Amino acid sequence: MDFISIEKGENLFWLGRYVERVYRTLNYLEGLYDVLIDTDETAYKEFCAALNIPDVYEDASDFMTSYFFDELNPDSVYSNLSRAYDDGILLRNTISTRSLAYIQLALDAMEDAKAEGSGALCSFEVIDRLLAFWGSIDEYLSSGQERCLVKAGRYLERLDLSLIHI
């Protein structure tokens, strides 16, 4: 039985949390995006309140742009994905370069969408990349202990978001 350092364990745990947070948030925002366009332009305020995110957005359009892409906003989808990537860089020898590449591809998809102005439409590609990441973790993370730490972070984040109905 190998020992895992506290730092490595934290990075594995938070990698799982950040990736799951982005995945779950994007899935939820797909439905919210339709509501914002079709019926209630202030529906994002409930989302912010549920996640305890400061409502610093001018309107629904500003929310969809800033909450998706603002790298200076610590609550944004992009910031969470960037933190997952930062943890992944530190763990590249553990999780494999291939697994890390899926997070990089998700970041690239977000950057391309921001440059093209396609906004929330990038969520499908990002979700696909994150699902590929989870499959890659199952395939290439050889240590059961390390895999369990990543999945513990994932499932705790899923539980946390489910409890607030996200």
Q: Where is each model-derived feature located?
A:
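Alpha-helical transmembrane segments and their helix-helix packing motifs
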Residues: 1-163
